[in-house]
């Protein structure tokens, strides 16, 4: 896959220095943009290309109204991924992005274009009921900000800068509406599903993470990292080392190569599944 491959609008590529074997389409948390993945290029093997999704209402698409319904978001993503030149790809999503990634995976499987793996980070399985205290999109501004801070639902820069919050509040609210009004049902994607959690993440319990097992009859693993809900920033290199191992293993499986079996059971401490 050449590094000069032209990708459609809405996908921000952080290309490698040589031809890549696979892409990782990355979906951010609520209110996040493609820029949160910019530092991943040099922390992943050159054989993997980071393709960050830029949805309307943020980053280079800030002037466009943010989407508030999951079907509209996934329709947009199916078009974007479909316009990419053929190549093996995995889907990675953090928090709300994991829910979007799961629905995108379902749609792509139905279309006969399955990803080689789904990696769901810092997110309860999407078919679980949303706790009442986590339904936020209708709250007034100040109450919404306080609730997000209390739930550790804001990245550090947003907690430190209220002007930043005011700028992106419509996008955050739209993303929350998209997630909180969406109801999923368990469906076997028939692809590997790997879950990442934060040891101090109060938003996602162990049971919430284990429930992702309902979305695959193939490989499943859970890995816990140091940090809270935004451990992908505080434990970035450890996360990316694990992500690279997942994608490389999934490529080998897709090519029919022999690999050691991954354990499905959760182990204590940090490692809970695939080695």
Predicted feature locations:
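Domain-scale detector for complete catalytic domains at protein termini or as standalone homologs
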Residues: 1-92, 96-266, 270-275
């Amino acid at each position: 896959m050449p590094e000069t491959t032209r990708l459609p609008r809405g996908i921000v590529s952080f290309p490698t220095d040589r031809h890549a074997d696979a892409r990782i389409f990355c979906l951010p948390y609520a209110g996040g943009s493609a820029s949160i993945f910019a530092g991943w290029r040099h922390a992943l093997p050159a054989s993997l290309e980071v393709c960050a999704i830029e949805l309307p209402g943020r980053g280079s698409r800030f002037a466009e109204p943010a989407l508030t319904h999951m079907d509209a978001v996934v329709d947009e993503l199916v078009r974007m991924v479909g316009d990419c030149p053929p190549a093996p790809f995995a889907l990675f999503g953090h928090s709300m992005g994991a829910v979007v990634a799961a629905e995108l995976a379902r749609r792509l499987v139905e279309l006969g274009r399955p990803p080689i793996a789904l990696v769901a980070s810092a997110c309860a399985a999407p078919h679980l009921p949303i706790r009442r205290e986590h339904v936020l999109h209708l709250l007034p501004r100040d109450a919404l900000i306080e609730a997000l801070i209390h739930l550790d639902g804001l990245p550090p820069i947003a907690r430190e800068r209220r002007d930043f919050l005011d700028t992106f509040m419509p996008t955050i609210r739209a993303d929350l509406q998209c997630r909180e009004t969406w109801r999923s049902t368990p469906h076997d994607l028939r692809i590997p599903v790997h879950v990442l959690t934060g040891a101090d993440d109060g938003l996602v319990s162990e049971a919430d993470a284990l429930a992702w097992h309902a979305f695959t009859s193939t490989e499943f693993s859970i890995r816990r990292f140091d940090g809270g809900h935004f451990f992908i920033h505080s434990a970035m290199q450890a996360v990316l080392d694990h992500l690279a191992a997942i994608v490389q293993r999934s490529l080998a499986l897709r090519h029919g190569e022999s690999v050691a079996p991954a354990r499905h059971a959760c182990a204590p401490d940090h490692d809970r599944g695939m080695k």
